[in-house]
């Protein structure tokens, strides 16, 4: 894998984690 691919993968993983945390946070609030 080249660096660009690794960077894109890292971004996708980060976005997925952020979405999961946001959903968990909203569920926790309500």
UniProtKB/Swiss-Prot annotation:
User: What kind of modification does the protein receive after translation?
Assistant: The post-translational modifications that lead to mycofactocin involve oxidative decarboxylation of the C-terminal tyrosine residue catalyzed by MftC, introduction of a tyramine-valine cross-link, removal of the modified C-terminal dipeptide by MftE. The released dipeptide then undergoes oxidative deamination by MftD, glycosylation by MftF and methylation by an unknown enzyme.
Q: Which Pfam families match?
A: MftA
Q: Where is the site Cleavage?
A: 28-29
Q: Which family does it belong to?
A: Belongs to the mycofactocin precursor peptide family.
Q: What else is known?
A: Mycofactocin is classified as a ribosomally synthesized and post-translationally modified peptide (RiPP).
Q: How does it assemble?
A: Interacts with MftB.
Q: Per its database record, what is this protein's job? A: Precursor peptide that leads to mycofactocin (MFT) after extensive post-translational modifications by enzymes encoded by adjacent genes. Mycofactocin acts as a redox cofactor of nicotinamide-dependent oxidoreductases encoded in the same locus.
| Protein name from the UniProt record | Mycofactocin precursor peptide
Q: What is the lineage of its organism?
A: Bacteria, Bacillati, Actinomycetota, Actinomycetes, Mycobacteriales
């Amino acid at each position: 894998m080249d660096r660009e691919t690794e960077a894109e993968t890292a971004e996708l993983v980060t976005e997925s984690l952020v979405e999961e945390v946001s959903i968990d946070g909203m569920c926790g609030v309500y």
